[in-house]
Regions:
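A structural signal for isolated positions on well-ordered beta-strands in alpha/beta enzyme cores
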Residues: 4, 27-29, 113
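Conserved N-terminal helical subregion
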Residues: 48-163
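Conserved Rossmann-like nucleotide-cofactor binding loop
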Residues: 11, 15, 36, 139
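Beta1/beta-strand and adjacent pyrophosphate-binding region of the FAD-binding site
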Residues: 1-11
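Glycine-rich FAD pyrophosphate-binding loop
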Residues: 18-41
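Glycine-rich loop(s) and the adjacent beta-strand/alpha-helix scaffold that form part
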Residues: 161-172
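Conserved FAD/dinucleotide-binding core of flavoprotein oxidoreductases
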Residues: 86-89, 95, 171-250
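Proline-centered flexible-loop/turn and helix-kink motifs
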Residues: 24, 59, 230-234
């Protein structure tokens, strides 16, 4: 049995792991356009329920992930000068790059073939494959190419967001609501490893325009967010990595 997986992100790699475990004799190959250690963004977050599923379906990768993650039980909400902490909400954060390397190594252990810097633009090359898995991300070219078959519904939400990072340590999943002269901004922040945290900034389209963010470079946008959230960053810098402003798409 031949299985081709297009896309070597976390979803494609985890699919490869589970398929190879279920079909040990199958030839499973993952095709990824980027290099093995390329990654965009910063940390990813998992709930306790997701961790339970990781442990259930592949204990070896689960234990490696939990060896690397930052764990917290609280949500801290900063609103109008007050802080509300709510316990009992277990989450963990993990570096996206670390997660990819863990899953790559686990897939190799099982005998999965990983081909990097291999851009697939036509799935017809896999005509002999018994199964093709499309895991090429939220902007999947294959989903668009076969729109008539898959019939996806893409709802582009109105709010703008930018994904940044910081060296600011955090002890809780942190939400900050900050009112500015232009309108409200929200920061969603969490630590994913020692010395590193993810900061996702969100605002409505009207506030986005009034704040002059349209057309700004990534660094200029980071500088503006650092000014707005200065008291929460506490002197720590904001980091960028493809941190352009975009809209949340909901895909069904």
């Amino acid at each position: 049995m031949q299985i081709a997986i297009i896309g070597g992100g976390p979803a494609g790699l985890y699919a490869a792991i589970l398929l190879k475990k279920q079909r040990p004799k199958a030839e499973v190959t993952v095709y990824e356009r980027n290099r093995a250690d390329d990654t965009f963004g910063f940390g990813v977050v998992f709930s306790d329920a997701t961790l339970d599923n990781f442990e259930k379906y592949d204990p070896p990768s689960y234990h490696r992930i939990t060896d690397e993650f930052a764990y917290w039980d609280d949500i801290a909400i900063h609103f109008k000068g007050t802080v509300h902490r709510v316990g009992g909400n277990g989450f963990c954060g993990c570096s996206r790059r670390t997660l990819l390397l863990i899953l790559q190594n686990r897939a190799r252990e099982l005998g999965v073939h990983l081909l990097f810097e291999t851009d697939v633009d036509d799935e017809s090359r896999f005509i002999d494959a018994d199964l093709i898995v499309l895991a090429d991300g939220i902007n999947s070219r294959f989903r668009d190419k076969h729109r008539a078959h898959f019939e996806p519904e893409v709802d582009l939400r109105s709010n703008k967001f930018a994904w940044m990072g910081s060296t600011r340590p955090l002890d809780a999943f942190t939400f900050v609501f900050e009112e500015t002269e232009w309108g409200p901004f929200i920061a969603h922040a969490y630590q994913y490893e020692v010395g590193h945290s993810t900061w996702i900034f969100e605002t409505d389209p009207e506030t986005f325009k009034r704040a002059g963010l349209e057309g700004l470079s990534e660094q200029a946008s980071a500088d503006r967010m650092a000014e707005i959230f200065a008291k929460y960053l506490d002197g720590y810098p904001l980091l960028i990595n493809r941190s352009m402003w975009r809209n949340f798409p909901m895909i069904r």
